[in-house]
Amino acid sequence: MSVAHADDADDYSRPTGESYHAEKALPSGDFYTGQWRDNLPHGHGKYLWTDGCMYVGDWHRGKTMGKGRFSWPSGATYEGDFKNGYMDGKGTYIDSSGDLYRGSWVMNLRHGQGTKSYVNGDCYDGEWRRGLQDGHGRYQWKNENHYIGQWKNGLMNGNGTMIWSNGNRYDGSWEDGAPKGNGTFRWSDGSFYVGVWSKDPKEQNGTYYPSTSSGNFDWQPQQVFYVDLSECVVCTCQRIPVLPSQKMPVWYGASEQSSSGNRTKNSERPRRRSVDGRVSNGEMELRSNGSGYLQVDDNAESTRSSLGPLRIQPAKKQGQTISKGHKNYELMLNLQLGIRHSVGRPAPATSLDLKASAFDPKEKLWTKFPSEGSKYTPPHQSCEFKWKDYCPVVFRTLRKLFSVDAADYMLSICGNDALRELSSPGKSGSFFYLTNDDRYMIKTMKKAETKVLIRMLPAYYNHVRACENTLVTKFFGLHCVKLTGTAQKKVRFVIMGNLFCTGHSIHRRFDLKGSSHGRLTTKPESEIDPNTTLKDLDLNFAFRLQKNWFQEFCRQVDRDCEFLEQERIMDYSLLVGLHFREAAIKDSATPTSGARTPTGNSETRLSRAEMDRFLLDASKLASIKLGINMPARVERTARRSDCENQLVGDPTGEFYDVIVYFGIIDILQDYDISKKLEHAYKSMQYDPTSISAVDPKQYSRRFRDFIFRVFVEDA
């Protein structure tokens, strides 16, 4: 990224807002010629870099914005839409080899509908995600073989049809670029083979049906993999050498001009609305206060109407380690012994197509664990107990569906490291435990919750199987420990994925329902730490997602809410976690709040190159999913002082770059008699629309209305 000093005396003498043609030879050796306003490129202009890169097109306040053409010294070119320095919108990219892509872009990535023509004669037309073929698409090879169907991460994956130029075809399931699962291979003479396909001959199983004319012939299904598909290789996309957003200069000198004596006080900064609804000329700056925080401070003339500093404290590991002497130490040992037994028990390979009997509530296994051990269980130092597995085949298949490795699963829960108990039980009375690596959360369950999960398990399984990007909680196991002796105590618990298992510190977390009664945390801002779960009336941000992510988010929230409504579930919430990216860049050892100065000519403090490297790094790209590890922006909001229960605050113009995590949690509360009574009782005291306990249909509608107000498209 180059640095451009715009300090010509002529610029300061011109009236504010006047555009004119300028030619700027920059200290770096770069050269700009074109429209110029307020000491920044603004309008149409050309920028030449010393390394041979060139941009010709529209500028807006020092950034490439609108239509433009970027060329590289290698001969590669991009022509199309730009936004904030990124290739974003519709555009055509021709790489140095001659491969051509024409279609949609989001933040330098091929994303949306697009066509790729390869110099060797191959062509792909279809959907893209994060730079790779993903969704529905058609790929045609130069020899006229073609595939039509689903793609994932640049490979044929899902249901699809391959048609060879000789008339043969395969219809069925694909995985990682090859047939996998149920499918039919047909020859041009009418004969066909139907069965289960796999590269592993042991898993291959099917029946060959010859045509009346061909008769029997010697053929092996593995020929499809090693002969028929040998020429059907999908071409890869050449990496873009240097991204335009990485080349964008940082223009220094603009902010100095804006505060010079040539301007009037009222023209120094665009105005913003303060917390009490008044308008102020808040000039803000990001600074360190020397106490482990970064904060945003207003100048003296707008202090009274400012929001005050946004403080982010260093994140600390949650929970208390359960060691010997802890009241739940033996329960933890029992749990670990049971998990090790359940997961390690030999079992036949399972298909994703489960029989109805696997979901039978009576489908459970009891195992006795005497202290001295038995034929099936090891000796242990805990008390004697019984262990129950609910629907073991279903949960084993769910772990397979969620790509959970059995050995890693056991190591996380049953390894040498102890579990951690969260400091206080939830509102429901349940206790929560975290594995030491933060991957899994274990929650104790009431009998009623257990019944709800078992009842909805068939629908839940079908839903998560059909919706790869579902936001609902991932369940990995449902178990029960029954202590022997006089107490005969039963402890039921479910193992879930931890949404905040991440290498990033979670600086803010929110639990959002869309209701207002009791949805406020009483802690003042100064006492809020990263482990504080804030609620609806504490929310002081709007979450801004890129267009394609936002559209996918809306679709998935609708599908998940429809599923929960059909199952008569209510009282669920959207758990949201924010990692402020500037905090990590400023000080990796002590995470602090990063703020983007919201007004005037000041530029973003985050490097675009950092964002590009994050988005295009192969390891990080693979980790980005809907609700997981997503780059986004948040805008700080403020509630009016005269509106006590205002759910969504007014925008302030303060923006922050974040990594956002979110998912729908607490999905095991049905609208039973207790919730109906709660609704009737509270409705006599409070506004019926403000309380959480409402009919599932009304709950779903209110939840979605609220979520779609606080999550918006980042235009």
Curated annotation (Swiss-Prot):
Region (Activation loop): 671-692
Catalytic activity: a 1,2-diacyl-sn-glycero-3-phospho-(1D-myo-inositol 4-phosphate) + ATP = a 1,2-diacyl-sn-glycero-3-phospho-(1D-myo-inositol-4,5-bisphosphate) + ADP + H(+)
Keyword Repeat part of the UniProt annotation: yes
Keywords (A to Z) from UniProt: ATP-binding, Kinase, Nucleotide-binding, Repeat, Transferase
EC number, as in UniProt: 2.7.1.68
Coiled-coil ranges from the UniProt annotation: none
Name the record gives this protein: Phosphatidylinositol 4-phosphate 5-kinase 6
Organism this protein belongs to: Arabidopsis thaliana (Mouse-ear cress)
